[in-house]
């Protein structure tokens, strides 16, 4: 069984962050200001909570500057210092055309070695307190995704970086996808 270790039994809050798409060199000061505000907001609701970063954390796939590595490292550490932090891969965090290449998040997470930082890289079921997180990995095909009916527990949340069929943009445009609800 895959377990996201937390110190509480019932999950109350999920602070959801996604598609940050931090650039190699641009707007880093602006990102830092926004991250500081984010840390302060999370601290207000940190009891029985986790941060979930839903992919596309970096922008440039596997092309990374030292500045980007530094900013990602600080972001992950600062969040994990506040609450358990769960991350998944987005299509901008890896090279989907070359599965032999390492994604850009793995070396950072591995080197931080933070007990509160959880990188859920693979499709699977991950128990976190009273919740079953079902991860659908960006490298997998939709036929390999685990269905909710096949997962035990009362609360099941799919962690997925991609389009779900019939999603709509803020302008009402429908986004097609093979992934159905």
List PLM regions with ranges.
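His/Asp/Glu-rich metal-coordinating catalytic cores
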Residues: 63-181
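N-terminal active-site segment of His-dependent metallophosphoesterases
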Residues: 1-75, 151-152
């Amino acid at each position: 069984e895959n377990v996201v270790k937390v110190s509480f039994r019932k999950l109350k809050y999920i602070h959801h962050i996604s598609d940050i798409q931090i650039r190699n060199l641009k707007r880093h000061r602006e990102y830092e200001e926004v991250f500081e505000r984010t840390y302060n907001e999370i601290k207000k609701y940190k009891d029985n909570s986790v941060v979930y970063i839903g992919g596309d954390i970096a922008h440039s796939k596997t092309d990374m500057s030292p500045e980007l590595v530094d900013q990602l490292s600080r972001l992950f550490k600062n969040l994990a210092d506040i609450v358990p932090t769960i991350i998944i891969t987005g299509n901008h965090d890896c090279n989907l055309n070359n599965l032999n290449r390492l994604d850009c998040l793995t070396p950072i997470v591995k080197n931080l070695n933070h007990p509160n930082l959880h990188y859920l890289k693979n499709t699977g079921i991950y128990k976190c307190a009273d919740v079953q997180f079902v991860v659908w990995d960006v490298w997998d095909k939709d036929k390999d995704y685990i269905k909710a009916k096949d997962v035990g527990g009362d609360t099941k949340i799919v962690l997925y970086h991609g389009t779900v069929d019939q999603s709509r943009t803020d302008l009402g445009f429908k986004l097609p996808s093979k992934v159905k609800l």
